């Protein structure tokens, strides 16, 4: 065709006369004859040949591979529609002929608008093949793209009006967004094919709310058709889908959102960068609890190791920071700080990279992002979700800032405050370490006296952010050695700060070291061994609650949670001490707040003895991270190294740290809830592990009749939405 255009001395194939086109047809026939590929002259034989070719392509390796990639069955049959064609040829001055494609909503925002392409004297999808420059459908499209030739709207306004009207009717009938192929034959519009349109999460929300508002679907249908995880796009900045990406690494999408900034390789460097007004992307092999300040200061986090429930992933989700973990195609240079790619590219401190926590991609340079949007269609849909759900949704929040974010996302309180995270902030780690290294109770109490006002101030912020709502504060949980430095230089510096010899610090650190610390002296065992620690925390909680109530005039609901209980005698001993501290505070302040004492059920034994525990507990909350570890015998921090293989080979249906195991861990939880409620029917039952916003886990909690789930602040809307879907599913099963 290009040769024919050149020979005729014209600019496009539209200008070729009948003789030139006849010569093109003869040339094509000759080429096909040489290949012994001439099509049959008989129409029925042509159809049979076409069907045979389609069947061959469908059953071939390529067709099977494409079906497998989309979750289809390799042996699935082929359905073919044979229909009369509208050719899109034979137009003239009076009427256009040709073919085009049209869409009726923005792929990105879901806003209703007509857009597409039209190619004169064409058939099928030729308008998208780039053989000639097509007309844009509307004036607004033409102006936006700077195209000079008139749009179809300008050449044939009646056609675009008919297209828009057809789109509206079909959307109401199908209750879906779609794209269509159309043909103009002597000016007559014919729709030849419909197919589902590509949609962003924002567009899906807009369509669902529009349809429900117009009555085309019910509100329940609107809630059912949205994937809760797709709501992440509304809660965090996301990368502009049309922006080019220079991909340098791929990992797991541990925490959604996107951020661009200069690379740094230590938590300290991240803090310095943030203090200088140039917050950075923190890249580490993996993170530990002492890195939390650097993670808080960073725009985003990348780790070479780790899984979806690794320390980096959990903390980043709680902070609302984009995070990619397990980026195995990247490595960190040990000689000098640098990030190295599998292709040999090198990125040094200060080089700009982008972290896309939604896709797990690490990208060179800065990439344009879209701001989150919590109004309009999203807000309307969330309102419907809240009207529908039964299950309460609280937030895991460790600071006043976290609690305020959670309140903004309409959390019904705090389901878990991890007090240990507070000790890594500001100048608190030094008195905490002084307390740990103290050789006697008197020195330990002196250090705790220094920490007490800090804890009280923190708790006051939490109560003020959640007036009248429950605030569950977990007493100190991790083993004490986690708060001590590991490097020789840091140990020496700590010794100088505390006036201790380096050998003395090392000796005490060795005394605290354990072979299996996650099953060692942690949780309530720390509170029993060092009662002054829990006594300080309980006093700070109750004093903070009184302060918040008196200063703000708002009700407060403190709930004190004891971690890692496995024997009822542990609870009895600690509850007695908590009540004793409360009486002392009452005597000093001449007032008291109503408080609850509960247990974090994290061991299989605690689940089995939940009836006994319920006699002394006001509430129970399942810590599914540790409960999953102990039920499976898996280390959450190490499981990421083999979990993908287990899931791929079908040993596990999914990562049990990411989505609750209904059959094993879930059965223990149901046993515990039933035994607890048999003793105390009104006992509150919740879940506060990482699975708190996972839709499948939320559905389990709804079916089990739990009272609430708790998740990171930025996932509260997802849990609220999943709870609504679970309520709809449960009601439809009744």
Predicted regions and their residues:
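A glycine- and small-aliphatic-rich helix-loop capping segment at beta-alpha/alpha-beta transitions
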Residues: 299-303, 319-326, 491, 637-640, ...
């Amino acid at each position: 065709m290009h040769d024919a255009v050149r020979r005729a001395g014209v600019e496009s194939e539209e200008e070729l006369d009948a003789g030139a086109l006849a010569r093109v047809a003869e040339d094509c026939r000759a080429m096909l004859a040489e290949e012994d590929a001439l099509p049959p002259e008989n129409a029925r034989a042509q159809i049979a040949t076409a069907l045979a070719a389609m069947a061959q392509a469908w059953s071939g390796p390529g067709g099977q591979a494409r079906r497998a990639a989309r979750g289809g069955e390799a042996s699935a049959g082929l359905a073919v529609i044979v229909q009369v064609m509208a050719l899109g040829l034979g137009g003239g001055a009076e009427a256009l002929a040709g073919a085009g494609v049209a869409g009726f909503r923005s792929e990105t925002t879901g806003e209703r608008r007509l857009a597409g392409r039209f190619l004169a004297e064409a058939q099928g999808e030729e308008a998208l093949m780039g053989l000639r420059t097509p007309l844009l459908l509307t004036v607004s499209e033409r102006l936006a793209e700077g195209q000079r030739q008139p749009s179809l709207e300008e050449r044939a306004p009646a056609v675009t009006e008919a297209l828009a009207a057809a789109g509206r009717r079909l959307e109401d009938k199908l209750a879906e967004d779609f794209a269509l192929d159309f043909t103009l034959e002597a000016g007559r519009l014919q729709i030849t094919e419909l197919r589902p349109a590509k949609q962003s999460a924002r567009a899906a929300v807009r369509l669902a709310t529009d349809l429900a508002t117009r009555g085309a679907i019910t509100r329940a249908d609107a809630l059912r058709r949205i994937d809760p995880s797709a709501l992440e796009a509304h809660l965090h900045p996301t990368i502009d889908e049309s922006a080019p990406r220079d991909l340098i690494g791929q990992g797991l999408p541990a925490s959604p959102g996107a951020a661009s900034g200069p690379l740094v390789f230590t938590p300290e460097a991240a803090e310095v960068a943030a203090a200088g007004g140039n917050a950075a992307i923190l890249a580490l092999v993996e993170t530990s609890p002492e890195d939390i300040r650097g993670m808080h200061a960073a725009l985003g986090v990348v780790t070479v190791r780790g899984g979806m429930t690794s320390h980096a992933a959990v903390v980043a989700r709680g902070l609302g920071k984009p995070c990619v973990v397990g980026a195995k195609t990247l490595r960190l240079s040990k000689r000098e700080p640098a990030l190295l790619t599998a292709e040999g590219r090198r990125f040094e401190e200060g080089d700009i990279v982008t972290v896309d926590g939604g896709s797990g991609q690490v990208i060179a340079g800065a990439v344009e992002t879209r701001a989150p949007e919590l109004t309009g269609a999203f807000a309307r849909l969330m309102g419907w979700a809240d009207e529908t759900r039964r299950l309460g949704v609280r937030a895991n929040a460790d600071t006043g800032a976290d609690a305020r974010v959670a309140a903004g996302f309409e959390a019904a309180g705090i389901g878990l405050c991890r007090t240990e995270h507070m000790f890594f902030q500001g100048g608190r780690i030094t008195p905490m370490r002084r307390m740990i290294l103290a050789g006697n109770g008197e020195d330990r109490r002196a250090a705790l006296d220094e920490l007490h006002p800090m804890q009280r101030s923190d708790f006051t912020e939490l109560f003020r952010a959640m007036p009248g709502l429950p605030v569950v504060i977990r007493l100190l949980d991790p083993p004490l050695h986690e708060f001590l430095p590991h490097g020789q230089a840091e140990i020496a510096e700590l010794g100088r700060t505390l006036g201790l010899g380096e050998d003395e610090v090392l000796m005490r650190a060795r005394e605290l070291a354990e072979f299996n610390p996650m099953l060692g002296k942690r949780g309530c065992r720390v509170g029993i061994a060092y009662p002054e620690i829990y006594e300080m925390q309980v006093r700070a909680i109750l004093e903070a609650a009184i302060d918040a109530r008196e200063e703000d005039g708002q009700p407060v609901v403190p709930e004190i949670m004891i971690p890692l209980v496995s024997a009822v005698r542990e609870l009895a001993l600690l509850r007695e001490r908590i009540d004793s501290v409360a009486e002392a505070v009452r005597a000093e302040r001449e007032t008291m707040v109503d408080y609850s004492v509960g247990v974090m059920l994290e061991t299989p034994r605690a689940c089995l003895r939940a009836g006994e525990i319920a006699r002394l507990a006001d509430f129970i909350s399942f810590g599914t991270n540790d409960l999953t570890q102990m039920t499976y015998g898996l280390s959450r921090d190490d499981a990421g190294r083999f979990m993908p293989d287990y899931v791929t080979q079908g040993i596990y249906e999914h990562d049990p740290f990411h989505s609750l195991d209904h059959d094993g861990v879930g059965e223990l939880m149901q046993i515990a809830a039933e035994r607890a409620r048999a003793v105390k029917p009104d006992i509150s039952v919740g879940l506060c592990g990482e699975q708190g916003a996972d839709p499948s886990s939320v559905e389990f909690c709804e079916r089990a009749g739990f009272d609430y789930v708790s998740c990171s602040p930025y996932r509260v809307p997802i849990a609220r939405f999943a709870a609504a879907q679970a309520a709809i599913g449960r009601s439809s099963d009744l």
